[in-house]
Amino acid sequence: MFSFKPHIKLNKWHIIGVAGVAYALISIVNHVLFRTYGLDLGLYTHALYDYSHLRFDDSTFFQETPRNLLSDHFDLYLVLFSPLVWIMGSYTLLVVQIVSILFGALGVYRFVDVCRNNGNAGSENSTNGFVMLAMVSFLLFFGIWDALGFDYHSNVVAAMWVPWLFYWLRQERYGLYALAVVMVCIAKENMPLWLVCILLALMWDYRRNRRALLWLAGGILFGVGYLVVVAMVVMPSLNPEEIHFMGKFKYMGDSFGEVAAWIFSHPLETVRNLFVNFRDSHRGDGLKTEFYLCLLVSGGLFCLFKPNWLLMMVPLVAQKMLSEDIALWGVGSQYSVEFAPVIVCGVFAMAAKVKKTWLRRTVVIAMPLLCGLVTWYTCTDAKAWVQRENVRIFYKDHYRQEQFDTDYVRKVLKQLPPEVSVCASSCFTPHLAMRDSVYLYPVGMCHNPEYIMLKSDDLPEDTASLTLIETNGEVYLFHR
């Protein structure tokens, strides 16, 4: 039932290749058509540029007052990836994100393979349909597609280390397991909390393996220590006024400690807020219900039969649903990608132990079908905010830019030498980020840029102080 025997043998590299093309059609096409934005690709690409020159980014790209970008998100991936910016330019982070997801899919393949074969990896040329369907489920998961449709984010890359963490721990390759622990932590200041919950959940699975338990305990101690040092010491020292991440939970407190205290002292309200719209805005109505339904249909329902793995999702759900930012509640953007490795690996690890053949087959065949259907729904009909033209690669509108002539924009961009300072509309800034001074309009006007490049809908009413250099009625280039 699970051995494919076509004339051309299907293997994992065929699946990876097809997924890579599909992901490039999402992410790279969006960038070519100026559907990537200042927040966040422009900001992070400019940070790469700064780090590649051995200096910190001062956040003036989107802030009036200079402050270290690491006080916004403590993201060390940008430092690690910065040399690549000299090779791939503004495409760097998009390529890194695509490659990382494919890397994560290979991790799913390896982990599910050893689960299916009771700890022994299958043949390199294996066409085991069970393992292939796990990969396909992962690559079709809605959180991954929606993340690809919106710029680059380091939590996507961090999540791709999790299947490898599962695999290396299962194989008792503890040095590589430790590498995965570190790589998850350094992505953002909230990643260690997720890591700690992952490792706590795994303790039940490895409860009879004393050595594995010691390594899990070590990972937990590292995660807690990293969280405390970064979130409670380093980031406040970089910006004493506010920790950006905590700004989304202001109603609970101004620090991790205050938020934790609020949760424990208001348990009923906390549980209620996980499911209802607690903001005075109708924009949040139905978003949480939609997300939970999508999560359950995409395999979350099967995870109910592996309850210790539900602990891995607790911090993910909490940071989404307890946030004051309504954008986090829904299925869109990068806010659901971490569920992919947990749910897919959990479901297939559980299915590998099912003795009833008909039940095992039902689960593993249903998973990619359900993941694909949910992703189609989120790309076409979701209530949550999703830029549909960014992710619908089978529609003509994905390959068009209706707001302006892209060839004209590229012509204007070539007129701006790299040494000049520029303030620009959001969609232009990722392409202008490889320079010392680039600013997001309109906040960047306070930095007195030499040139201003705007879309027509960003055009200010008063342009008397600006000298028009060129326009086609859709895009304007000014000198100041």
Give, region by region, the residue ranges found by the protein language model.
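Signature aromatic-anchored transmembrane alpha helix within multi-pass, membrane-resident enzymes
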Residues: 13-20, 125-129, 217-224, 353-385
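Transmembrane-helix motifs of polytopic, lipid-linked glycan transferases
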Residues: 91-120, 164-167
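Hydrophobic/aromatic-rich transmembrane helices and adjacent perimembrane loops
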Residues: 98, 102, 310-356
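Perimembrane helix-loop-helix junctions
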Residues: 194-224
